[in-house]
Amino acid sequence: MSNAITMGIFWHLIGAASAACFYAPFKQVKQWSWETMWSVGGIVSWLILPWTISALLLPDFWAYYGQFNLSTLLPVFLFGAMWGIGNINYGLTMRYLGMSMGIGIAIGITLIVGTLMTPIINGNFDVLIHTEGGHMTLLGVFVALIGVGIVTRAGQLKERKMGIKAEEFNLKKGLLLAVMCGIFSAGMSFAMNAAKPMHEAAAALGVDPLYVALPSYVVIMGGGALVNLGFCFIRLAKVQNLSIKADFSLARPLIISNILLSALGGLMWYLQFFFYAWGHARIPAQYDYMSWMLHMSFYVLCGGLVGLVLKEWKNAGRRPVAVLSLGCVVIIIAANIVGLGMAS
């Protein structure tokens, strides 16, 4: 396996670790509605950071975006909005299925859809079917799904042992939302694929290869921001017991603390895709769609490890932890199989 591929896998791991940890600061926010907290974090992660980073990278910010016609920008924006819909459905999936089953089904579907639909759309699926490297990467995807399934099972055992249940368990509604979440969340993978002309234009301006994907985030995350912030603002305006005015009428130290914690959560959310761009840049072009598989499987891996570090599994017993450990090992094996496939 080449050093470039190894570093690509490593950066995807770092990005996934940030994704697994980003909600920790949000959990420390006090006396704010979820909608206000999510909006503040989202403004940082989807608007302020993408625009700021792009302004620092590009020699002429407005000229760069002005060179693209609507046929280039609109698919990138709409795929970003598609991801935004999946993001909202994610929370509802947890509500009706519980954390473990919801995450397992949603992540499994988005891993398959986001990874395999891209080469199909690009007309490159024959690379997977007719080459040795393609066979290896497909095997890696299959093994990753097994790993996700094992971690999901560990989570179910933990929830059963600790008496944790879904807020409003509804299998039919939860499965529908999980499928929708999985499909729509893959919009981020499709957006990265549609944004290739933007990446090439950034490279032509002399932007370092590690950073060429970052300017496209202004458009991708703009689409996601429209859906997420629109959802939050509508709820803040219409739901009777929600009030942004009340959230900002607390004691000043608490408001400042909540803003900083929400902003930190937003920063950590953004960093997952900052390092995703670094990893993506190191993956061979013919296998660039495997970035999504690496990111999502590592997200499950890191989520399990973070849970262990934070002692969320302390009272779960030995069997759930053993099953979790097995799932993490399988995901690591899957990443190595994919790496070997890309190198062959």
From Swiss-Prot:
- Which Pfam families does the protein's record reference? RhaT (PF06379)
Quote the catalytic activity from the record: L-rhamnopyranose(in) + H(+)(in) = L-rhamnopyranose(out) + H(+)(out)
Q: What is its main location?
A: membrane
Report which superkingdom the organism of origin falls in.
Answer: Bacteria
Question: Which residue windows are transmembrane per the record?
Answer: 4-24, 38-58, 68-88, 101-121, 131-151, 175-195, 214-234, 259-279, 290-310, 321-341
Q: Keywords, A to Z?
A: Cell inner membrane, Cell membrane, Membrane, Sugar transport, Symport, Transmembrane, Transmembrane helix, Transport
Could you name the Gene Ontology cellular component terms for this entry?
A: plasma membrane
For membrane topology, the record states: Multi-pass membrane protein
Which Gene Ontology terms cover its molecular function? rhamnose transmembrane transporter activity; symporter activity
Q: Where does this one sit in the cell? A: Cell inner membrane
Q: What does this protein do?
A: Uptake of L-rhamnose across the cytoplasmic membrane with the concomitant transport of protons into the cell (symport system).
Q: Which family does it belong to?
A: Belongs to the L-rhamnose transporter (TC 2.A.7.6) family.
HAMAP family referenced in this protein's UniProt entry, alphabetically: RhaT (MF_01532)
Name-wise, this protein is L-rhamnose-proton symporter
What is the native source organism of this protein? Salmonella typhi
